[in-house]
Amino acid sequence: MAELTEKDKAIQTAMGQIERQFGKGSIMKLGAREIQAVPIISTGSLALDKALGVGGFPRGRVIEIYGPESSGKTTLALHAVAEAQRQGGIAAFIDAEHALDVAYARRLGVNCDELLVSQPDTGEQALEIVDMLVRSGAVDIIIVDSVAALVPRAEIEGDMGDSHMGLQARLMSQALRKLTATIGKTHTTLIFINQIRMKIGVVYGNPETTTGGNALKFYASVRIEIRKATAIKDGENILGNRTKVKVVKNKLAPPFKSIEFDLMYGEGISKTGELLDMGVDMGIVDKSGAWYSYDGERIGQGRQNAKVFFTDNPEIFNQIQARVREALGLSSPTPKENGKEKGKAKP
């Protein structure tokens, strides 16, 4: 064994002092512990799981989902809640907008009987509740809907015409400073839903911005933009929207990946439509003209008919889904794989 240099001895002494003062594990060499795969919660969309690069929403991170009104922000978040619950996780929904549709959430697969819901009166109250849930170490995913509805107490108690410049931005900045370290220890996925506003006087460039200041942009490990693309029609009836999702920021994989899926009214993300598109892209499902085929057998003429075939034949749907997941390197998540150690974070 090589003799330690003065520099090595000095760093070992410093590390020893740090561990005695702040606890074991407060500092270590990165190579001293095995690098583990990032634990995730599926987004509910195979295409988005692939675009995120790690197989879903990472645990122990802050995530922002933003976009125009009625673009599918809450729907995407509720799909993630349903996936977390399927893995045996506990989910919480901070309904700052007081607009959670329980019947719709159930249709998306959310177990509403087990969902923790809070409808806070002020932004401070909402973020304190989030902090307490995170520190419990028992909650797997928390949705805050939305940042724009986190109104500071001073604004609620003040008069209608009063100016409250920067109050919400300061509130978000302070909360995120507290929350970021804690969620890393408890492996809680914290998703903020945000709205879009327009900057005044912008001539060049994009005038759009999100509410709540810049803190969330910095602290978020993943930022997702969601927008309507085109309407999905059956004759004159609009059944849903083709929706475009872009990963604007990603600290865990290359960003700027874009995907599209069908967002159907009353149903959420169309699993059949998404699987059909991915199956064709991967060569698992054959497309010739308007006809779709699988294993040499025709499954439908036109996209809508092929989607209906998948709905009527779940065994074929499951076969194709298994092949797509295998091709993507995505295993079916289980509580054991993605489970986290339950324990209280240090106050």
Swiss-Prot record:
This is Protein RecA. Residues 327-347 are annotated as: Disordered. It is found in: Cytoplasm. Keywords: ATP-binding, Cytoplasm, DNA damage, DNA recombination, DNA repair, DNA-binding, Nucleotide-binding, SOS response. PROSITE patterns: RECA_1, RECA_2, RECA_3. Can catalyze the hydrolysis of ATP in the presence of single-stranded DNA, the ATP-dependent uptake of single-stranded DNA by duplex DNA, and the ATP-dependent hybridization of homologous single-stranded DNAs. It interacts with LexA causing its activation and leading to its autocatalytic cleavage. It comes from Desulforapulum autotrophicum (strain ATCC 43914 / DSM 3382 / VKM B-1955 / HRM2). Disulfide bonds: none annotated. GO terms for biological process: DNA recombination; DNA repair; SOS response.
